[in-house]
Amino acid sequence: MNEIPNHIAIIMDGNRRWAENKKINKIIGHKKGIEIAKNIAIESHKIGIKNLTLYAFSFQNWNRPKIEVESLFKLFNDLFEDKSKFFKDNGFVFNPIGRLDELNNLMRKKISRLHENTIDNKGLTINVAINYGGKEEIVDTIKKISCAGIDFNLLDVDLLKKFSYLPKTPDPELMIRTRR
């Protein structure tokens, strides 16, 4: 049986350790991770994968040293500004997920612009998780259900999915956590 998964999710972990082991700047490790993610997206599309989720910055990453967080967000800032060509050239959809409302205004605008500029593309959908945490998504989902006035006695897996960050995207069939 050689079925291609519809949805692959990758927890992008180990870029910093890779750079430390090579005795180079950590931000170079993160840049290398982005280049690898781009290659994964291209190859995923070539073999027929429809959805790719990249966990890029977790809610817990805020606990890293301030200089590292600032460097990462400068990298994200540049990425969202420069990569619209990457998404356009490949026909990819950029779909951001996470607590985006907690990001600074400039970052939210760039994320929104990239999403809007790619929403009609027909290729691979790349869900990029920024300021994301699984527990936080559960809390946000429950809050949305509560705001909708739905009786919690009706709560089931399908209802949770309907109010999740990716209600129309199938769950990942393959989850990968990279390491050094």
Model-derived regions: residue spans:
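Flexible, compositionally biased loop and terminal segments
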Residues: 1-180
